Swiss-Prot record:
Gene: secA
Family, similarity comment: Belongs to the SecA family.
InterPro entries reported in the protein's UniProt record: Helicase_ATP-bd (IPR014001), Helicase_C-like (IPR001650), P-loop_NTPase (IPR027417), SEC_C_motif (IPR004027), SecA (IPR000185), SecA_CS (IPR020937), SecA_DEAD (IPR011115), SecA_motor_DEAD (IPR014018)
Protein name (Swiss-Prot/TrEMBL): Protein translocase subunit SecA
Top-level lineage group: Bacteria
Topology term for the membrane: Peripheral membrane protein
GO BP, one annotated term: intracellular protein transmembrane transport
Lineage of the organism: Bacteria, Bacillati, Bacillota, Bacilli, Lactobacillales
EC code: 7.4.2.8
Amino acid sequence: MSNILRKVIENDKGELRKLEKIAKKVESYADYMESLSDKDLQAKTPEFKQRYQNGETLEQLLPEAFAVVREAARRVLGLYPYRVQIMGGIVLHNGDVPEMRTGEGKTLTATMPVYLNALAGKGVHVITVNEYLSTRDATEMGEVYSWLGLSVGINLAAKSPAEKREAYLCDITYSTNSEVGFDYLRDNMVVRQEDMVQRPLNFALVDEVDSVLIDEARTPLIVSGAVSSETNQLYIRADMFVKTLDSVDYIIDVPTKTIGLSDSGIDKAESYFNLSNLYDIENVALTHFVDNALRANYIMLLDIDYVVSEEGEILIVDQFTGRTMEGRRFSDGLHQAIEAKEGVRIQEESKTSASITYQNMFRMYKKLAGMTGTAKTEEEEFREVYNMRIIPIPTNRPIARIDHTDLLYATLNSKFKAVVADVKARYEKGQPVLVGTVAVETSDLISKKLVEAGIPHEVLNAKNHFKEAQIIMNAGQRGAVTIATNMAGRGTDIKLGEGVRELGGLCVIGTERHESRRIDNQLRGRSGRQGDPGESQFYLSLEDELMRRFGTDRIKAFLDRMNHDDEDIVIKSRMLSRQVESAQKRVEGNNYDTRKQVLQYDDVMREQREIIYANRRDVITANRDLGPEIKAMIKRTIDRAVDAHSRTNRKDAIDAIVTFARTSIVPEETIGAKELRGLKDDQIKDKLYQRALEIYDKQLSKLRDQDAILEFQKVLILMIVDNKWTEHIDALDQLRNAVGLRGYAQNNPVVEYQSEGFKMFQDMIGAIEFDVTRTMMKAQIHEQERERATQYATTTAAQNIQSQAIGADFDSSADFSRVERNDACPCHSGKKFKNCHGRKAF
């Protein structure tokens, strides 16, 4: 073990020596750059661009370019990057992560690699976790870039597509991680090239990279559309039933946070809904609503997992930052179940049109780099998933913060009493205190106790984060007491007020350990910036969430040794801190394994998404006739249909092929079995294909000119691709839930998902080609639409393309015995089974 540790330390030292060598080269240009006039310094940008065009690499330009930015920052901002910041900038340019402590000037460090990479003219994206930081950094650092002749854009959610396009065309674009992801998805849903806003993804520099690429790695970005639904009453009824249950009627698995009805709960459900068997196929919709109502009532907690806004909206709380996640909703009906639980307006269910995780979004950039103060604990994940190394950068001044040993109490009550007493003592001597909590609920509780103790304070949590930067800025003033959820206010420095250094600097008090050591380190790092004095102290109790879920038997043994009559007794032990850390490592390991598994599943979707999006983009950007592609689809559709039916006896095969031809290729009265009898399969294929080509030419002759034909072809393909892709996303989601159970049969769920997902993708491609064929052959192209065929709108597309073949008679005699809840209903209504006959009993 010690050999491995020594090797790691030596590797880090060797890396730092290399960085220092390049940094000294940058510093060697300092006097020369200082001697240049403003005009000459600004002229360096076009000079570098020309040299890059002439074949010099960015690595060759680096020392000089970094020196130019240093001098420009000194003249424009009055700030001059230190050597450690130059080293951090080199690491960023190499596509790695410099671990730089809080207050070491990460924002200024980024200016050097951002400027250098912007010289290539392919765009640089600086990614931050919220719009406040994007706007602040773009405004402050943008002065340097603008002064040096580079354009800077800010991409905000509220901007129009035209404004977004302009922002992305700039040399440097500031944006949030979510907005870049949503823009990528929306770009792959448009029908005209001019509606796209992004350029190809080149270089992203992610601020607080651990927050985006680790904490939010599993978060899918979802673009969805509302599905018309009459399910609100069903959510309310399921909620009313679940609220009648006793604790023996359901079973909760605490570590995995899963829940299900017990036998007594099933009996109650059957009685409440007047059913003979809750798990009968006909009740598949009902079990879905009941499962969600159970989760909403007994797993999802108000002020921890979500808050209710003043407007009566359910807002998700980010478990890592404590911020509310505006515009995000729990999926698969859970959000509606929570709305029913809280008695607020139930919003419509939505259907996913496009989705991507941050893991796959950021892996699409040609080069990816990031900055953070705490990433070493996740080094393996950064290396394996993103191919990024973590390089710890030394601080400019030694750290003077004192980190005290954790204090452990028996109960939550005794722990909070001790926290309030500590805060009061420090407040009375004027030392500023930042109290960090894991949940909104805890911050409200401590706030209440501080009010009772007569201590004035500010609360920063998911309920009022719009004031967060202001509150955090004042947290270092004399006598300031601030309560903050987790890492709220991250990215904003806490500067010490007058006389605070003499009092010991800012004291950070953690009210419990987070399940990730990194988050605890971030909280500690709020104190002691740039060599300032400071303190940190964590208070724990045996009733904390981490202890209850993952505490070891050795920790629990402490409780037995305690004097139960005196709950205020406190344990202070290094060994205890190590035990807590090992519990955290276990959780981090579990979380990493989960993220790795999510990535394995998501890679299946990624490969398929890239194929669909590449083909889609090819259609959108096409200036050529798409006839060859459409004809190839028609040919494959005919071949598939004939091959599929030729396996039955010949008479039945001919009848089936005739039915296919009548419904999908030719006018009904123009073909009969007689015509095809006696022909071989290849002859039938050729005959049908020739007939299809005649109809194809006839259809296109109704359109005004070549532009109208191209627009029609594009709309035809894109409309069907988008529709089928949306259905496929939903189907993959259901498959993923289903294969999880196959582990019990000794089958690897990921392998099963990959093979079945591939087969479903092949089927989807076949379905796209079939629908393109059928719609092309059967569409009614109205005379009055000719003049408007070049003006795309989804409504025009729907008017231009009205397929006679789509839709079948309602079949009330269908067999429902083997139908899954997300399958198409056998009655041919066009709805999913769960939204049609699967709902009937409910």
